[in-house]
Amino acid sequence: MRVNNGLTPQELEAYGISDVHDIVYNPSYDLLYQEELDPSLTGYERGVLTNLGAVAVDTGIFTGRSPKDKYIVRDDTTRDTFWWADKGKGKNDNKPLSPETWQHLKGLVTKQLSGKRLFVVDAFCGANPDTRLSVRFITEVAWQAHFVKNMFIRPSDEELAGFKPDFIVMNGAKCTNPQWKEQGLNSENFVAFNLTERMQLIGGTWYGGEMKKGMFSMMNYLLPLKGIASMHCSANVGEKGDVAVFFGLSGTGKTTLSTDPKRRLIGDDEHGWDDDGVFNFEGGCYAKTIKLSKEAEPEIYNAIRRDALLENVTVREDGTIDFDDGSKTENTRVSYPIYHIDNIVKPVSKAGHATKVIFLTADAFGVLPPVSRLTADQTQYHFLSGFTAKLAGTERGITEPTPTFSACFGAAFLSLHPTQYAEVLVKRMQAAGAQAYLVNTGWNGTGKRISIKDTRAIIDAILNGSLDNAETFTLPMFNLAIPTELPGVDTKILDPRNTYASPEQWQEKAETLAKLFIDNFDKYTDTPAGAALVAAGPKL
């Protein structure tokens, strides 16, 4: 007997989940809305209705990803290809897991899900049918099903009829691993992957982003091995078909800056770049909402309506939302299907080749200029450096801005060595004749953050070509080409030295930051190509 138009208990038994009598298969948004607001639910399962029509949920103590609890099974599939945390100079979160410990964790999750009423969502990761992953998500929590329905690409009825999953995600958020110490793991919580079984297991953390970023890590493994760029970036396209991609870590402005009324959105966070052009991995957006206002970010604000899902925001008794309240976390979020943004690429989230590549950084030191034009070598250097300030609350335990270097602007999600991503990106850029820029959305010498208004004007100047035609001067030490003036931008802020009481103050901070860049890049100098790029970085 097929249950709910899709799945039999016998199919779940193949994954180790038994005694399931009620499967809610690919639930509609209306059904999820009813399920989330069910008054009989308790704890983190229960949603709250807000005045904007969206349901808000609380993800518990995990208000961001837990990178220290991420593991990958080390076996014949992955041993010689994965970028391991315990090999080489590079620092990453890809900790090896033995097949035996994997079986134990799998047993914990399948035991948790067995005998329960389960939500099963089948969806695609990747807008290109040739390279997409067909993913099956299994959870006992309605809002987690809602999250993946928002964030991944929703199949048509015809596609569902022939759906065969390439990857299984079993979310056992309610279970933990009591044997973690004996197994040499970080804690009782776990986010584990097995490339041979094509499966992800989640235990202990309720944070929805573990499912989203888990599949991103898998695409980051599979695509570059086929010569396809896999990128932690947003992307949009202009009226003339000109495509721009925006790289950057969480909170640097990827979603905000790519959501532009003058351009159609391809996607806000994860993309591939193949022989046909740039394509989205996702079917939704996951926007930060801290200090969100309708005036500053109208597209995102207006996307928060029925079917959107808010996380960790403060909801007052009357259902209104206090977007300024970061007492729970600075990493408050909303997920929504991409069609909640009016100006999107339809019907499929993909476009042609990118001609503008923008690296977004939030410089906590106030040293880097608001914008600079990069040479080919500087493009590779700054891509591999991936400098930003880690912004409050996107990972557990980080509440103040601290400088960080994250290879390819997404080291946490890289499955291969960073140089492999740089090589693929450079090949794609060269073939398309693309130009790269470094844009600082962070702070300057005044201690204030560069305004969204100024940053938007800078992005406009990049996209309409006026920056390429502008006169430039060179910022010492970092050797960056800075425009002398740009339309709509306060000229005084273009040279970061002007925002300090004295040039010596900038010089002092610049030397500190330059040393951090140089020390960080040392890990790439063990190859001739990496050593050759040192000259493109800052010099003391």
Swiss-Prot record:
Q: One Gene Ontology cellular component annotation? A: cytosol
Family per record: Belongs to the phosphoenolpyruvate carboxykinase (ATP) family.
- Known SUPFAM superfamilies for this protein? PEP carboxykinase N-terminal domain, PEP carboxykinase-like
Record carries keyword Manganese:
yes
Which gene codes for it? Answer: pckA
GO molecular function annotation? ATP binding; metal ion binding; phosphoenolpyruvate carboxykinase (ATP) activity
InterPro entries in alphabetical order: PEP_carboxykinase_ATP (IPR001272), PEP_carboxykinase_C (IPR013035), PEP_carboxykinase_N (IPR008210), PEPCK_ATP_CS (IPR015994)
Question: What PANTHER family does this protein's entry cite?
Answer: PHOSPHOENOLPYRUVATE CARBOXYKINASE (ATP), PHOSPHOENOLPYRUVATE CARBOXYKINASE ATP
Amino-acid positions noted as binding substrate in the UniProt annotation, renumbered to this chain: 65, 207, 213, 333
Q: What is the disulfide pattern of this chain?
A: none
- Entry binding sites for Mn(2+): 213, 232, 269
Protein's recorded name:
Phosphoenolpyruvate carboxykinase (ATP)
Q: Which cofactor does it need?
A: Mn(2+)
Which PROSITE patterns does the entry mention?
Answer: PEPCK_ATP
What are the binding positions for ATP in this chain? 213, 232, 248-256, 297, 333, 449-450, 455
Native source species: Escherichia coli O139:H28 (strain E24377A / ETEC)
Question: Which residues are recorded with the post-translational modification N6-acetyllysine?
Answer: 87, 523
* Transmembrane regions listed in the UniProt entry: none
Q: Which GO terms describe its biological process?
A: gluconeogenesis
Q: In which pathway does it act?
A: Carbohydrate biosynthesis; gluconeogenesis
